[in-house]
Swiss-Prot record:
This is Large ribosomal subunit protein uL4. Residues 64-77 have a biased composition (Basic residues). The gene is rplD. The keyword RNA-binding applies. The lineage of its organism: Bacteria, Pseudomonadati, Pseudomonadota, Alphaproteobacteria, Hyphomicrobiales. InterPro entries: Ribosomal_uL4 (IPR002136), Ribosomal_uL4-like (IPR013005), Ribosomal_uL4_dom_sf (IPR023574).
Amino acid sequence: MEFNVKTLEGKDAGKVSLSDAIFGLEPREDILARVIRWQLAKKQQGTHKAKGRAEVSRTGAKMYKQKGTGRARHHSARAPQFRGGGKAHGPVVRSHEHDLPKKVRALGLRLALSAKIKADDVIVIDNLVAAEAKTKALASVFETLGLTNALFIGGAELDGNFKLAAQNIPNIDVLPIQGINVYDIVRRGKLVLSKAAVEALEERFK
């Protein structure tokens, strides 16, 4: 499909061809959900921990004799039913990461790109370059383009001034093409691709 290219100033800068195999797929929310769940599981720290009865700092001696007191039979005060005892089946330090086939991950990325195209939430910019690293100036440019919540994807090398100027603007993310991912595409309103990013995606999925 043919897609209009704009400059950061909002002027026309020609057209670019977008492959239907990447940007023209029918939506599959189940695949997107699987990929996002996989991404978030990888990010989760998993440092949660509660001490079990073997780990709490408390005597392990029998509380009182077995018979003759008329009270219930107990052994260690570390048991979970007692205040200060260990937690039964508590959380342990672990990795929440799980496997997801590479083909499903690749399909998820293409589906996310297609969903943004279908929602008319994609803008292609000829070049993501800022003359100076000034947040105020770049924020004004974004406001003119109507970009209040957006993910910018540049080429393999990001322009230093653009990256610095954009990083203090709320709800704006800037990533090189290597960092493109389903979660960041879905969580932001608009997807802004540079021409270099489009070419890299075409090369990646051809």
